[in-house]
């Protein structure tokens, strides 16, 4: 039986290995090499005078990590956190950051051949955050550039928060 086109194995250069997660009805993918770990929701400590996009900080094994809720960052409506809510811990330009997502779906590999450049707006997410769209057999996967989700200035503010 043939594999779906998006799941065919090619050379390592032809494949993207991604962590996929959901925010609302949209499914996003980020490069697995940026992801350090995925955690269940932890208690977030609010930080006075933190930027609006920062929820606060968590203590992860003795390291203080700033937390950003992607829902808020993307201008989506708030949602109560539940048993599926996760914190995706990533490293961006030497700064460790936790992004709150509604749920983590899976780790997957897709061929670069099934990706397309981003349309101007996808699911309310601005184009500059998106590197492309992966066309899977049963759904579309929005490929995020986490380095662009926070500007370099905002990344500097995160260092101050932590």
Per-region residue spans from a language model:
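An acidic, low-aromatic, low-complexity terminal/linker signal
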Residues: 1-162
């Amino acid at each position: 039986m043939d594999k779906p086109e998006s799941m065919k194995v090619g050379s390592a250069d032809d494949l993207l290995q991604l962590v996929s997660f959901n925010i609302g009805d949209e499914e996003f993918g980020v490069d697995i090499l940026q992801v350090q770990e995925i955690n269940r929701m932890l208690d977030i400590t609010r930080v006075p005078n933190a930027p609006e996009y920062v929820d606060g900080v968590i203590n992860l094994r003795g390291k203080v990590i700033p937390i950003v809720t992607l829902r808020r960052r993307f201008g989506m409506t708030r949602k109560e956190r539940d048993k599926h809510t996760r914190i995706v811990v990533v490293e961006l330009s030497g700064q460790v950051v936790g992004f709150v997502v509604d749920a983590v779906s899976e780790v997957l590999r897709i061929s670069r051949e099934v990706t397309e450049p981003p349309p101007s707006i996808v699911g309310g997410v601005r184009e500059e955050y998106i590197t492309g769209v992966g066309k899977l057999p049963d759904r579309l996967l929005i490929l995020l550039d986490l380095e662009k989700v926070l500007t370099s200035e905002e990344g500097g503010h995160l260092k101050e928060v932590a």
